């Protein structure tokens, strides 16, 4: 295994800037890694080797000409296949968009290109970001590098697995109900959901417009901070984009001092239904934060218990509206258009064949919740619960600077275990959904492996709107303490998928 793929993004960027190694060499090392392990992991749906090498050579040429480039110039990145990309397919993990190549770049993609970051390709995901295991992809599941018989989380499981398998040092995902934080937790890496509106949604194919948010994956808190800073900022093309200064997340990640910080442990996000191993690691981390000088206490957010139910009314309702645009008329799959059928028949045939079971389930849920006889009873009530959750957060943040909880109730579960039990699958996002409903910022940081099964456990840090820097301050402190205690990062213990393909067949 090349030493280059084991380097952090910050280390690689420094080496490239000092011309100790070329961006092309770094890119080739990661392309070689993808070729070696992705047949087992299946993190990528599309690898753009030619485009990546061209972008890397351009960085090398600009450095040779004496240009000063961004802090991540030349560093490779994996991109969730939910962003429009000029010259690359965008499928959203769905047959209905198979082969579609958009004519424009999403704002996040343009910012990545402008920063000189090298896009390796597009990663696998649950279809239209609907799922918690990446098993809902129309193109097959992604596998967890820690155990190839288990899920990598979802819906951004491909991006998380790519980083955990050392196929890319950085990745971009999206988080609607936990789809960055939950995969990060079960693959032993760092994942951040920025404040809603802090990163542009222009060109992000919408699942739930009031909840979707793009964010970074990385193997270290500092790497995640640099990527967060690169993609954040106001975008006039996104009506929900916040026109406010981006919090200095990089400085916070370099600080990592929690002395005097008030940290609230959310009472409702613990207890029955949580794996004993997850609870053990979480409570060890709580004690560690207190030992590091934080002022740790318990806080109650009583309406969090209704968050899951509210989310599964609000998100499907928005999904049923957003996915109406996939009508077989202008782009994507079109079936039955032989001159004998009406446009309505073509649309029905295409949507029946193009959408998977989970997408159809959520469209039906949303359509029902928005129907005239049930709108107020279901969708209207869910929005009232959302307001109560926002109020819970506001009250908690009057007493505490950040809140913490386990990121997920369990470690990574076996592939296939919950496919036929939607409710059990939905419970994977129990801890993460409240943040999306409120629009706050949150991060998952690894805190060790469960003593029960040896799989990674994540701790979730939650901060107020536009206080994203607090996430990085706490995350960096935990990461540094873990490294001091063990002598390494947790992700350094991940098995090599190339040598451990049992269960991948």
UniProtKB/Swiss-Prot annotation:
Protein role: Allows the formation of correctly charged Gln-tRNA(Gln) through the transamidation of misacylated Glu-tRNA(Gln) in organisms which lack glutaminyl-tRNA synthetase. The reaction takes place in the presence of glutamine and ATP through an activated gamma-phospho-Glu-tRNA(Gln).
Enzyme class: ligase
Alphabetical GO biological process terms: translation
Active site: 80, 155, 179
UniProt keyword annotations, A-Z: ATP-binding, Ligase, Nucleotide-binding, Protein biosynthesis
SUPFAM superfamilies reported in the protein's UniProt record: Amidase signature (AS) enzymes
Full protein name: Glutamyl-tRNA(Gln) amidotransferase subunit A
Subunit structure: Heterotrimer of A, B and C subunits.
Organism: Acidothermus cellulolyticus (strain ATCC 43068 / DSM 8971 / 11B)
Gene3D superfamilies: Amidase signature (AS) domain
Lineage: Bacteria, Bacillati, Actinomycetota, Actinomycetes, Acidothermales
Family: Belongs to the amidase family. GatA subfamily.
NCBIfam families: gatA
E.C. number(s) listed in UniProt: 6.3.5.7
């Amino acid at each position: 295994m090349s030493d280059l793929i084991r380097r952090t993004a910050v280390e690689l960027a420094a080496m490239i800037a000092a011309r100790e190694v070329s961006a092309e060499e770094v890119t080739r090392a990661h392309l070689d890694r993808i070729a070696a392990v992705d047949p087992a992991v299946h993190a990528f749906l599309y690898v753009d080797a030619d485009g990546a090498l061209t972008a890397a050579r351009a960085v090398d040429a600009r450095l040779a000409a004496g240009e000063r480039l961004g802090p991540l110039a030349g560093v490779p990145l994996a991109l969730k296949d939910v962003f429009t990309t000029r010259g690359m397919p965008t499928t959203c993990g769905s047959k209905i968009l198979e082969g579609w190549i958009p004519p424009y770049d999403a704002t996040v993609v343009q910012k990545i290109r402008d920063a000189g970051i090298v896009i390796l390709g597009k990663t696998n995901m649950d279809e239209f970001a609907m799922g918690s295991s990446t098993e809902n992809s129309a193109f097959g599941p992604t596998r967890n590098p820690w155990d190839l018989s288990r899920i990598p989380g979802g819906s951004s499981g491909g991006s998380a697995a790519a980083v955990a398998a050392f196929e890319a040092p950085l990745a971009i995902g999206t988080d609607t109900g936990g789809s960055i934080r939950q995969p990060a937790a079960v693959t032993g890496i760092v994942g951040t959901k920025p404040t809603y509106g802090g990163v542009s949604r222009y060109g992000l194919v919408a699942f739930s417009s009031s909840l979707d948010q793009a964010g970074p994956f990385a193997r270290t808190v500092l790497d995640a901070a640099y990527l967060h800073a690169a993609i954040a900022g106001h975008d006039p093309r996104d009506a929900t984009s916040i026109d406010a200064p981006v919090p200095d997340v990089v400085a916070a990640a370099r600080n990592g001092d929690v002395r005097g910080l008030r940290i609230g442990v959310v009472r409702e996000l613990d207890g029955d239904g949580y794996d004993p191993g997850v609870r053990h690691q979480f409570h060890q981390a709580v004690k560690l934060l207190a030992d590091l000088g934080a002022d740790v206490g318990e806080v109650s957010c009583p309406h969090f218990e209704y968050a899951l139910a509210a989310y599964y009314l609000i998100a499907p309702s928005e999904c049923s509206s957003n996915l109406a645009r996939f009508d077989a008329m202008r782009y994507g799959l079109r079936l039955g258009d032989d001159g004998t059928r009406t446009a309505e028949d073509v649309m029905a045939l295409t949507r029946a064949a193009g959408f998977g079971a989970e997408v159809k389930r959520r469209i039906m849920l949303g359509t029902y919740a928005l129907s005239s006889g049930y709108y107020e009873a279901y969708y209207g009530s869910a929005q009232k619960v959302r307001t109560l959750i926002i109020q819970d957060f506001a009250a908690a943040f009057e007493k505490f600077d950040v809140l913490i909880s386990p990121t997920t109730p369990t470690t990574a579960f076996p592939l296939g275990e919950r496919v036929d039990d939607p409710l059990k699958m939905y419970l994977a996002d129990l801890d993460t959904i409240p943040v999306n409903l409120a629009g706050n910022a949150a991060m998952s940081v690894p805190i060790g492996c469960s003593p029960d099964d040896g799989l990674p456990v994540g701790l979730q840090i939650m901060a107020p709107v536009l206080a994203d820097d607090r996430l990085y301050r706490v995350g960096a402190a935990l990461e540094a303490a873990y490294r001091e205690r063990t002598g390494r990062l947790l992700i350094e213990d991940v098995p090599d998928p190339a040598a451990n393909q049992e269960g991948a067949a």
